[in-house]
Amino acid sequence: MSTTGPQDAPTHWRGILRHLGPGLIITACIVGSGELIATPMVGAEYGFSLLWFIIGGCMIKVLVQVELGRFAISKGMTTLEAMNTIPGPRLVVSWLVWCWLFMFVGILFQLGGIVGGVGKVVAELGWFAGFGGTGVFTIDRLIALVVSAVTVAILASGKYKPVELFSIIMVVLFVVATLFALASLQWSPEMAAHSISWGDIREGFQFRLPGDFSTAFAAFGIIGVGASELIYYPYWCLEKGYARNVGTPNPTNVWYRRTQGWLRVMRIDACVSMVIYTGATVAFFLLGAALLHGTSGVSNETMIADLSKMYAPLGEAGLTIFLVGAFVVLFSTMVTASASNARLLADGLVLFQLKKPRSEKERAKLLSQCCIAVPLVCAGVYLFVGAPVSLVLVGGVAQALMLPFLAGTALYFRYKQTDKPLQPSKVWTALLWVSAIAMAAVGLFQFYKKLT
């Protein structure tokens, strides 16, 4: 992070590389429950035919992500502060911030499901088979408590750098684990029956839609950048120092030129992360299509176990590597999502006037307290509710319902709040409309499904 005043953005790739980071944190957050559970489920149900849909679902939402980041960097405002400027009814805060609060509660349930998923994956490894009891003291619940405690230890300082470093390590690990999982299908004689052919890939790009589209449409709300990650991203851009490097908004040519430079860095950061999480998501989809399509009894509840059993022909080592990869994916989401939601909680408490920090030191203390509280609350949710996949789906529905509002917010910022020199091109704007319409359609579909 920058510790100085305004400075011009780097133009050489080495300098740009040093300033990447927010997107990697989001990537570590994204490749989690949606990719490990929902995406293979789409492959299991529809085979390879929806590969194009999975790729599009990952790529299209990045336009809204960049637009929210553009506003944060140019105005120096957090996402909730930005949402609080949206016109409409107010009760202490904007109606849109109240919508976020509903989603936030759903996300706490989702994180409870994720920490439970980590517990179940570690339990599957069998390393702690002699531990645990009954009721709330089963092995998966005890592991969930330990995972939450480790998460608190990583995040307790409330600082940016530990989260970025952790995210980079996790991204490297789950990319390696995913490549192993796919490579074993292609080159291991024991897995030859499940190998993926070019014919399978061609089938995935015939742009066909199945008659019953519900599972795929539900997955669209979770895969790639979900509503929560769209809200998280500007926070990490601010903490990385993009807005500080831009300086106080000042409608001069020098300021606009400097801002355009840092917006370019932000776009590169977002696109690099998109390439990584799209690749990982596609890999999980291909695993589901290759290993589980056409099998009976596949469900969300048993997805990880079903996938892991398919690797039994590789022996103990292959199964262990797959489960370790699943652990890395879920644990990275737990840590980075907890860090992100802690920032939202601290910001929300201030906006709702429940906390009034009088200095940066007091605000940092509040953030540290929230970094401790969020993982512990999520562990409590899993201990007393259980059913990790149901908890994950509650958060997924809450996020999907928020997507139309975020799509509209991005368009509002584009047309009403962005200075003309900083506005995107006509092509970008057209793609932004496509992205916003697709996101709104997903949210409305989820709402309809719940009503019926």
Describe the predicted segments one by one:
Residues M1-E35, S94, Y242, Q260-V272:
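Membrane-interface "cap" regions at the ends of multi-pass membrane proteins
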Residues S2-G5, T39-M41, V66-V92, V122-G130, ...:
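Flexible loop linkers connecting adjacent transmembrane helices
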Residues A9-H12, G47, S74-V105, V136-F137, ...:
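Transmembrane-helix boundary/entry motifs in multi-pass membrane transporters
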Residues R14, G43-V66, V92-W95:
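Extracellular loop-to-transmembrane helix junctions
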Residues I26, F53-T85, F102-G112, T336:
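Juxtamembrane transmembrane-helix boundary signature
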Residues V93-G132, L330-G348, P388-S390, A440:
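Hydrophobic transmembrane alpha-helices that form the core helical bundles
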Residues G126-A156, M170-A183, K361-A379, L403-Y412:
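Transmembrane alpha-helical segments of multi-pass small-molecule transport proteins
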Residues V172-G211, A216, G226-Y235, T409-K420, ...:
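Hydrophobic alpha-helical segments and their helix-loop junctions in multi-pass secondary transporters
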